[in-house]
């Protein structure tokens, strides 16, 4: 793939959760995960155009690390989008009912529109970790392509996808193995 191709990248990393907590001992990761170091080593800055947006999904538990990943990939933090989910999820302190998306910018990547709020109530997806289709609709309405979705769970017309759960994907090999 040519360097500097994508104007917008969406990433939903397989954050590693240490399930050593007694409440989580019965759980297993439903997919291979990556450590913070492995995520930071991905050459995302090579894939992004000189002017680009990055939408980086994170959980409350990984928020402090997500800023470092965003920076390692060559982006500057600009804003956060909050997905307010119906119902309660898991959580050690509070039961999480939100997920966060950090918006990073590289260069000066103009927005198509500026009338978008920072919180959204989208339906909860049926599959584990799947994000709402309405989110990618929002991204397309705000940011310019070409588009790449990293760690994709499905294919989308007009997007390149990379991930072990999409039907067709760009085959990048980095030599990493799932986190223990």
Can you describe what each PLM-predicted range is?
Residues 1-180:
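Class I S-adenosyl-L-methionine-dependent methyltransferase catalytic core
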């Amino acid at each position: 793939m040519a360097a500097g191709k994508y104007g917008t990248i969406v990433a939903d990393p397989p954050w590693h959760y240490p399930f050593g907590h007694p409440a989580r001992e019965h759980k297993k990761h439903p997919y291979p995960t990556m450590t913070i170091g492995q995520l930071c080593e991905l050459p995302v800055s090579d894939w992004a155009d000189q002017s680009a947006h990055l939408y980086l999904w994170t959980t409350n538990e990984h928020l402090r690390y997500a800023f470092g990943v965003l920076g390692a990939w060559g982006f500057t933090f600009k804003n956060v989008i909050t997905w307010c989910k119906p119902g309660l999820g898991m959580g050690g302190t509070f039961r999480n009912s939100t997920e966060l998306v950090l918006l990073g910018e590289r260069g000066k990547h103009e927005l198509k529109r500026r009338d978008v709020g920072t919180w959204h109530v989208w339906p909860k997806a049926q599959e584990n970790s799947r994000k709402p289709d309405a989110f990618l609709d929002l991204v397309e309405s705000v940011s310019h392509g070409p588009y790449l979705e990293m760690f994709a769970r499905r294919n989308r017309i007009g997007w390149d996808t990379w991930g072990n759960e999409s039907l067709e994907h760009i085959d990048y090999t980095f030599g990493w193995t799932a986190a223990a």
